[in-house]
C-alpha cells in the first residue's frame, strides 16, 4: 500500500491522469477483463509465489492484441552478477508465457544485463 500511495502522489504532482494504480494479491492483478493494453513486469515474474495464477490473471485482463513485456536478468549470461534465483532464461519465459496462450512477438536485446521479451494476446 505504501508504494501505491507514493505512485499516486508522484502521478498527481505531474498531472498524469491516464494511470490507475491497483493493489494486487499474490494470485490476481485484480483488473477487469479485457481492460489493459500493456502489462510490463520488470524483475518481477521470477519473484512471484504463484506465477501461473498471476499470468492467467494478466492474460484475462489484456484486451485482444494487448501485450505483456517480461524484463528479467539474463540467466544465459554468466557475466550477469545476479544470483541465479533472480534470473530467467528467454527459453523459460517463452515456455511459460506461451503455455498461457500468449504469442511471442519479439525479444529486445539492447539492455545491458536483462532481456525484454514481448508477447501479444491473440
Ranges and model annotations:
Residues 44-47:
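A short His-aromatic
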Residues 4, 67-94:
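Conserved class I S-adenosyl-L-methionine
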Residues 100-122:
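Core SAM-dependent methyltransferase catalytic element
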Residues 12-17, 64-65, 101:
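Short helix-capping segments at alpha-helix termini
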Residues 37-42, 54:
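A short beta-strand submotif of the Rossmann-like class I SAM-dependent methyltransferase core
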Residues 52-67:
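A short glycine-rich, Lys/Arg-flanked "PGG" loop and its adjoining helix->strand segment in the class I
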Residues 1-29:
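Class I SAM-dependent methyltransferase SAM/SAH-binding core
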Residues 29-39:
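A short acidic, Gly/Pro-enriched loop at the edge of an enzyme's catalytic core
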